Structure formats: C-alpha cells, structure tokens
Amino acid sequence: PQEPKPPYPYSIEEVTFTNTEAGIDLAGTLTIPDGLGPFPGVVLVSGSGPQDRDESLMGHKPFLVLADHLSRRGIAVLRFDDRGVGSSGGEFQTATSEDFTEDALAGVSYLEGQDRVAATQVGIVGHSEGGLIAPLAAIRSEKVAYIVMLAGPGVPGIDILVAQGQPIGLAAGAPEAVIEMNSRVQRALADIAKEEP
C-alpha cells in the first residue's frame, strides 16, 4: 500500500457534520493545505458497499492517497465514513442513492462553511457508485461547482452487480452452477423492482 508519509504540507482534522434532512451526523477527515487560502474544496464520495472515509479495501486506502495528493496541490479535501459505517450515524443497509446524494451535499455545505475554503469552488469527486452520486448532487444543488467521476457506472446497475458477482463467487469457491443461478435471481429481482411503482 502506498500510504502518505509525513511531513504533510496540510492540516488534518477529524470532523463531524450533519445531514439535517436525515438527522444524522457524519464523521470524516478534513485536510486543508498550509497557507492562508481560501482554497478550492472537494468532497470525496465512495463506491458501493459500506465504505470508511479512506475507502479501505484489501489493505489499500485510495481515498487517503487521493486526499494527500489533492491537498499537496492546494485543494481542501473532505472524506467521510458512509452513513452507518465507522463513526458516522445512520443506517447503511436501508440507504438509497438519494440518501447518499444528501450526505454528499451535506459535505459540500460543511466545506463551504470553512474559513479557509473558497465557498464557490467546492465540488465532488465520486468513485464507482460515487460517480453516480456526484452528478445527482450537481443536478440537485447549484452549490456544487464541479464534479469528477472516477470509474462511474456506464451500464445499468444490474449488469454491474452480475459482472461483479461472478468473479467474487469464483474467488469464494462457489460452484459455477450456483454463480449462474445467483445471476439469474439477481436479474429476476431487478425485473420485479422495475415493475413496482
């Protein structure tokens, strides 16, 4: 893993901000470059599944690395634990894309309120499912100055789930017949969900 090493040319602060619409507190880490500012800001929005603020996966922490990279280049970065994960309140399992969009916008509002952040220069970088959340947030609020989508979905969600499920099933040692049945069940459930109002 390529974790950043000190000295850091930025401050690191553990923070909490509130999604007032949902009534939950979200916990994260704010990095602000050294200097007077104001600096442009960005909220990092994670991919699918319950993610911590560093988007930790298999010993890697891509959001920690990305926050370091951006803050070393003069950008304030807020990364946060998904609702119901780590130190954040709320419930992850029942959350929808709309809920995650509101969480991201709460992060944008929090950054805009920071003295050393340029309020009109706050955007969102979304990875994977976060690449779906970022444009939803930008459509919802003019406060979002820009978006960056990293490996955002370019195909229907069910196709992503099936494509991801097959190698995961193989890696877990599941028989191919079970993996194929799981794919059929996922597609059938997606079809049922489309029919429901």
Residue ranges and their predicted role:
Residues 78-80, 84-95:
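Glycine-rich "HGGG/HGxG" loop immediately N-terminal to the catalytic nucleophile
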Residues 131-142:
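Short glycine-enriched nucleophile-adjacent loop
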Residues 148-197:
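Accessory cap/linker subdomain of secreted extracellular hydrolases
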Residues 38-48:
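Short beta-strand element of the alpha/beta-hydrolase
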Residues 94-115:
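Alpha/beta-hydrolase active-site loop
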Residues 1-37:
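N-terminal cap/lid segment of alpha/beta-hydrolase-fold proteins
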Residues 56-77:
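Short amphipathic alpha-helix adjacent to the substrate-entry channel of hydrolases
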Residues 116-128:
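Alpha/beta-hydrolase fold nucleophile elbow
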